[in-house]
Each structure stands twice: as C-alpha cells, then as structure tokens.
Curated annotation (Swiss-Prot):
<comment type="similarity">
    <text>Belongs to the D-alanine--D-alanine ligase family.</text>
</comment>
<keyword id="KW-0436">Ligase</keyword>
<dbReference type="GO" id="GO:0071555">
    <property type="term" value="P:cell wall organization"/>
</dbReference>
<keyword id="KW-0133">Cell shape</keyword>
<feature type="binding site">
    <location>
        <position position="268"/>
    </location>
    <ligand>
        <name>Mg(2+) 1</name>
    </ligand>
</feature>
<dbReference type="GO" id="GO:0005737">
    <property type="term" value="C:cytoplasm"/>
</dbReference>
<comment type="function">
    <text>Cell wall formation.</text>
</comment>
<keyword id="KW-0963">Cytoplasm</keyword>
<feature type="binding site">
    <location>
        <begin position="148"/>
        <end position="199"/>
    </location>
    <ligand>
        <name>ATP</name>
    </ligand>
</feature>
<dbReference type="InterPro" id="IPR016185">
    <property type="entry name" value="PreATP-grasp_dom_sf"/>
</dbReference>
<dbReference type="Pfam" id="PF07478">
    <property type="entry name" value="Dala_Dala_lig_C"/>
</dbReference>
<dbReference type="InterPro" id="IPR013815">
    <property type="entry name" value="ATP_grasp_subdomain_1"/>
</dbReference>
<keyword id="KW-0961">Cell wall biogenesis/degradation</keyword>
<keyword id="KW-0547">Nucleotide-binding</keyword>
<feature type="binding site">
    <location>
        <position position="282"/>
    </location>
    <ligand>
        <name>Mg(2+) 1</name>
    </ligand>
</feature>
<dbReference type="GO" id="GO:0008360">
    <property type="term" value="P:regulation of cell shape"/>
</dbReference>
<dbReference type="InterPro" id="IPR011095">
    <property type="entry name" value="Dala_Dala_lig_C"/>
</dbReference>
C-alpha cells in the first residue's frame, strides 16, 4: 500500500549509520506500538538528513533493553523518532531524564498530556481552546444504541496517526452494541464537525504556517489517507481569509506554549462549514517526518529544507532536571 518501505533496518537492532561526525546522535525509532511502520519511515529520512548534516548516527530499534543500548553507545543526543506508545507518551523522555541524555521533542508532561485524548481535552478547555462536544464511554457501560446523535467520531484514548478512529455517519450500517473496543476499554465519542481539515506546523514555539487537507478518496483523514499517496491533496498555504489564518496560527502557538511543548509539533483543527468556527482536534508532539508528512512540507514552503528542519529540531535537545 505504501510507496515508502522500511527494508533498511532489521527488528531489535543497533545499526551504525555513520561512524564519523561532530556529535553522536542516537536515532531511536521502531518500537512496539501500532505506529511502528510510520516511525521507521520517519527515521529513514531523519537518519539520512543527520548524516548529510555531518553527524555520527546510530539507529536503535526501541525495545525493553533501550537503557542498556543507550548506556553502551553513549550518545550526545537522542533524536526521538518514535510514534505511539513508549515514545510519544512520555515514557522515553522520562528514561532519558533519569539517564541525563538530551533528547529532541517534548518532555514527559507535554508528551503524556498530548497523547492522552481525555486529559489533553481537559487541558485545552481549561485554556479556552474550542473543541467539539464529547463524552467518554467505557466497555462496561454496555451501550446498545448510538451514545450521541449521528454523525459522531469514535476515538481511542491513546493512539496516534488516526489509528482506531471511526466516523459513524447517518447512513452507516453500524450497531454500537457490536463495537469491540480494540484499543482499550474506554473511548471518546465526539460530535462530528463537518468542515475543512487544517494542519499547523509549530517549531520552537512559533507557528511556521498551515495547510489544508483535501480528501480525495476516504470520508475522513484516517491512517490510510495520511500515509498513502493519492488519497489526499495538501493545499499549502491553507487558502483562508487572513483573519482566520492568523487566528489558526495563534491558537496553535497557545496550545504549544501552554502545554510546554518542545521542538516540532503539529496542531490539527476543523474549520466548521457555515460558521467558520475553529475546533481544535489535537496537538501531536512527535509529528511524522515521512515523505508525505505535513511539518516538513510546511517548513519547506517557508524556506526550511528537510536537513535544516532536522538540525533546528536537534538544537532544542535537552533533558529535564
């Protein structure tokens, strides 16, 4: 399905990509989550960019022995290229804080908050960020009918890349009584907002710009659409009135800064049809770096090529005391 494959690395290994350079970077990716493939595709591009920029690079496939591997190679910096559980949820940053190894992307609090859709929603609302109405449903509630009026969105608590997200439309042959809760015993049920899908790239606290996603095949911006060529068109910059565009960037910066994010992030919004009201969907503290990813595309439009983007992210590396 995907044009970009991950034959360059075998599972659970340390692989020296470059043994000479100004600093030694451990590129941590792969791992055990449902987003393993995306992580490896991101890491391939990041690894090449780091080598081109003159760094010594060692790839580490995330596993239970990650601390042993890091102790063995003694990197100057960890480039956290993980997506999903253990990397994006704050686990790896927590370990690196203990080991006193500087790392890219957000720390424990921002990562864990952004990854948990329930807690991030509470954070957004506390900071007056507009979101769609939602409720939490547990498997034990034994709901037999639609929990809210259709159309609505089903979201797992802690998955990225739209894994497990389903949109239930009026005409769908769907019975909630048969929903099997594949990604945990609780889900968020969110009112579906019909509108324009907008994405904002943020780097070091400043919004670089925004683009709009135009769906070409699927009904919503799901995993397949995100990572398969020809399923979506990116309009960069997003064709919006200036006042709405500026508000979109300011809201994104507000989310990033109040959550104390670091490095690169991507904020997602819906601009509701008819009302032009912005609804925040989420902030991703570990945005993809694949050839189809949004942050590199927006950065490139604004004059930051991929190698420079990776170097800018690397400059933010630190650990938390």
């Amino acid at each position: 399905m995907h044009k970009y494959q991950t034959h360059w690395v075998e599972s659970s290994e340390i692989k020296i990509l470059s043994d000479k350079g100004k600093k030694h970077i451990a590129l941590v990716a792969g791992g055990m989550s449902a987003e393993r493939e995306v992580s490896l595709i991101s890491a391939e591009g990041v690894g090449k960019a780091l080598i081109e920029a003159g760094y010594k690079v060692t790839f580490i496939d995330m596993g239970a022995d990650i601390a042993v591997k890091l102790h063995e190679i003694k990197p100057d910096i960890v480039f956290n290229c993980l997506h999903g559980t253990y990397g994006e949820d704050g686990c790896l940053p927590g370990l690196l804080n203990i080991m006193r190894i500087p790392y890219t992307h957000s720390g424990v609090l921002a990562s864990s908050l952004a990854f948990d859709k329930v807690h991030s929603r509470s954070w957004f609302l506390t900071n007056n960020i507009n979101m769609a109405e939602s409720i939490v449903i547990s498997k034990g509630d034994n709901i037999k009918t639609d929990p809210i009026k259709r159309p609505y969105v089903i979201k797992p608590f802690t998955q990225g890349s739209s894994i497990g997200v389903e949109v239930i439309f009026e005409e769908d042959d769907f019975n909630f009584a048969n929903y099997d809760f594949p990604y945990g015993d609780e889900v968020i049920i969110e009112k579906y907002i019909k509108g324009r899908e907008l994405q904002v790239a943020i780097l070091n606290g400043k919004a670089l710009g925004a683009l709009e996603i135009k769906l070409l095949k699927n009904r919503f911006y799901d995993y397949e659409t995100k990572y398969t060529e020809g399923f979506a068109e990116h309009l960069c910059p997003a064709p919006l009135p200036t006042d709405i565009y500026d508000k979109l960037l300011k809201e994104s910066e507000k989310i990033y800064n109040t959550m104390n994010c670091k490095g690169a992030a991507r904020a997602e919004f819906i601009l509701e049809d008819g009302t032009n009201k912005l609804y925040a969907l989420e902030i991703n503290t570990h945005p993809g770096m694949t050839p189809l990813s949004i942050v590199p595309e927006i950065a490139a439009y604004h004059g930051i090529d991929f190698v420079n983007l990776i170097e800018e992210i690397l400059k933010t590396a630190s650990f938390e005391s």
